[in-house]
Amino acid sequence: MLSCNICGETVNSEPDMKAHLIVHMENEIICPFCKLSGINYNEICFHIETVHFEQNAPEKNSEKLAAVQYGHSDRKNTNLQSTAEVTSGIHSACASSFPKESSESLPKDRTVKHEAFYTENITESRKYQKSREKKPGLSEAQGSIYETTYSPPECPFCGKIEGCSQDMEIHVKTKHASLLESPLKDCHQPLYDCPMCGLVCTNYHILQEHVDLHLEESSFQQGMDRVQCSSDRELAHRLQQEEDRKRKSEESRQEREEFQKLQRQYGLDNSGGYKQQQLRHMELEVNRGRMHPSEFHSRKADMLESIAIGIDDGKTKTSGIIEALHRYYQNTATDVRCVWLSTVVDHFHSSFGDKGWGCGYRNFQMLLSSLLQSDVYGDCLKGMAVPCIPKIQSMIEDAWNEGFDPQGASQLNNKLQGTKAWIGACEIYTLLTSLRVKCRIIDFHKSTGPLGTHPRLFEWILNYYSSETEGTPKIVCTSKPPIYLQHQGHSRTVVGIEEKKNRTLCLLVFDPGCPSREMQKLLKQDMEASSLRQLRKSVGNLKHKQYQIVAVEGVLSPEEKVARKQASQVFTAEKIP
């Protein structure tokens, strides 16, 4: 009876013990270099020859194989004991020979590569064994472990078959040396870290190829970034162009609307002038039943006749107001210390034909009505009558054609007839100067008192009317004509100024917006103070940002007229303050 030194089991014969030990070896054998287990003896031999050929010299390997496989049958106990010792020696070699630091010194990917390599070797060994088993005519001895181990080896990498193990070893070392690098104890092989990702390479050339891949990828990414950046810039440029186009289109639209609004406001929208507006209003009155058709035709005929001869028909005129004011201040006004009145002047109010834009023309009619009643201006205004509005427009165009105020003419397109264009202080000055009437423009361009008031304006008008008066009578009828007063959007005519007993000043103003029925209330004999409310304007009533006045001061000589025409090429006004 034979007893197994490994597990204690007893067997009857040496072949049974040998088979029993082989079972132990197949189940328990472990690679002494890398601790690979779970494979049979033939597989572990093939594994050691191919993977650990540098650590396992041929002669040592032969001794191990002989110790395990070539024991004599006569030395039963000794062989079994030796076999057990070899087996335990193999186990101890696996524990002592495998470097403890190897797993730590190698990167994880190197370990993965070796495991894959071991699995491949084992697979190849098993394939070789199966092919041997399938060949017919082989005896049991020929299929033994010796023949499997020393049969013509095949390269596990490229499949080449060599005549012996030494030739295969040389082949693997020379052809597949880079694949057989394994961790060795106390091995100081230089390693190369990738500067871009930290990968450890065992060969400088491999590192160079690896870094080149990084650079190619970076270059490709940069190229893609440049393409993307270029595409983004192009898209941004297109969006900016579209935004600029829309903004310019919107600005152009707003500019056109504002320009058209200004054209309508100043009567330059080609919608007709005085004549067309008068006819439209009269037709509207007929349609509403406020005017009989016969009256429409009668008034139309009168209007056409007035335009044809160039003289105002007088239907909007109110005369005698200055005389009525003189009577009032003489008999009734007890709160007034002194009053200065201009020369006689007629009031003209707007009609259907010039409503909304004709205040400047109506104020010129008032001023001219005063000048025509003065002998001082008889020479320069000889044979004139108060003109109608279309005639005044024609007279201003004639003054422009003479060379007066070219800048103002260009702003109005050198045309007033047939339009509803407003006129202001510059046009009044131009027209009077062309008629040889001496006048001046004074610009009160900013307020000179609290709350936006203009006390300097009142002081200037007081000095204008009181300059030729000695003493302080209550009522002073001066020889000074009325003053044209302009502010933004409207104009009026100053016909006098009164000083209260408390020394406050109040202007007396004719407004072309006031209808004749209101002005005629001033002609009553028993006129009340409340009737003057529409004429009186205190300092607190004039709070526009800017005021301009045109004051008449006499007659120009022909030479002075030429000089003033030359000066009007660059029009300037006197500024106060």
Swiss-Prot record:
The record marks 486 as: Involved in the stabilization of negative charge on the oxyanion by the formation of the oxyanion hole. A zinc finger (C2H2-type) spans 2-24, 29-52, 153-176, 192-214. Residues 124-137 have a biased composition (Basic and acidic residues). InterPro entries: UfSP1/2_DUB_cat, Zinc_finger/UBP_domain, Znf_C2H2_type. It catalyses: Thiol-dependent hydrolysis of ester, thioester, amide, peptide and isopeptide bonds formed by the C-terminal Gly of ubiquitin (a 76-residue protein attached to proteins as an intracellular targeting signal). GO terms for cellular component: cytosol; nucleoplasm. Residues 248-273 are annotated as: zUBD/ZHA. It is found in: Cytoplasm; Nucleus. Keywords: Acetylation, Cytoplasm, Hydrolase, Metal-binding, Nucleus, Repeat, Zinc, Zinc-finger. Its EC number is 3.4.19.12. The modification N6-acetyllysine is found at residue 261. Gene3D superfamilies: 3.90.70.130, Classic Zinc Finger (3.30.160.60). Deubiquitinase with endodeubiquitinase activity that specifically interacts with and cleaves 'Lys-63'-linked long polyubiquitin chains. Shows only weak activity against 'Lys-11' and 'Lys-48'-linked chains. Plays an important role in genome stability pathways, functioning to prevent spontaneous DNA damage and also promote cellular survival in response to exogenous DNA damage. Modulates the ubiquitination status of replication protein A (RPA) complex proteins in response to replication stress. Belongs to the peptidase C78 family. ZUFSP subfamily. PANTHER family: ZINC FINGER PROTEIN, ZINC FINGER-CONTAINING UBIQUITIN PEPTIDASE 1. This is Zinc finger-containing ubiquitin peptidase 1. The gene is Zup1.
